Amino acid sequence: QSEPAGPPQPYTFSYDNTDEYGTRIAQEETGDENNNKVGSYSYTDPNGISRTVKYVADAEGFRVTVETNEPGTKTSNPADAQIVSNAATDSYSPSPASSPAKPPSLAVNAAPITIHAVHASPVVHAIHAAPVSYATAHHVTPVIALSHAPLTYTLGRAKSA
């Protein structure tokens, strides 16, 4: 494991971006020399539906509050996360991004259909088997196994009867 390089350094960063469709994404955070963090991040879609998360992380733990107007949400406090909802009580129906599709229209008139009679004719094709030959050269290196084994000699005379 590596040792920390030193005490936490204070920092601040943020960004706020809106794309060409109108979706906005933003975040900001500040950290201090005691490693405490305070920040938020948010998302807003082109229809105005938004969610903002505000958080604090310090010696007392991580605490978060979510502010939203997302349909189907209500103010609650699950898992010690405060959710504040400003959602309308009626149902949500987003505006259509484009008009409904229309059936395609024909640009040209169809050409008349011509029918030709097809007559079967015999196919004459001679099939001859081609000779198969394989020429391979195998170069085999002789293997000589040498091993040193003890030899036992018995010297003496055979006993006479």
Curated annotation (Swiss-Prot):
Alphabetized InterPro entries for the sequence: CHIT_BIND_RR_consensus (IPR031311), Chitinase_insertion_sf (IPR029070), Cuticle_Struct_Prot (IPR050468), Insect_cuticle (IPR000618)
GO cellular component terms listed in the entry, alphabetical order: chitin-based extracellular matrix
Residues with PTM Pyrrolidone carboxylic acid: 1
Bias (Pro residues): 1-10
Record keywords, A-Z: Chitin-binding, Cuticle, Pyrrolidone carboxylic acid
GO molecular function: chitin binding; structural constituent of chitin-based larval cuticle
Polar residues bias locations: 67-86
Record field: compositional bias (Low complexity): 87-103
Source taxon at top rank: Eukaryota
UniProt xrefs under PANTHER family: CUTICLE PROTEIN, CUTICULAR PROTEIN 47EF, ISOFORM C-RELATED
Protein name, UniProt field: Cuticle protein 16.8
Organism (species): Ixodes ricinus (Common tick)
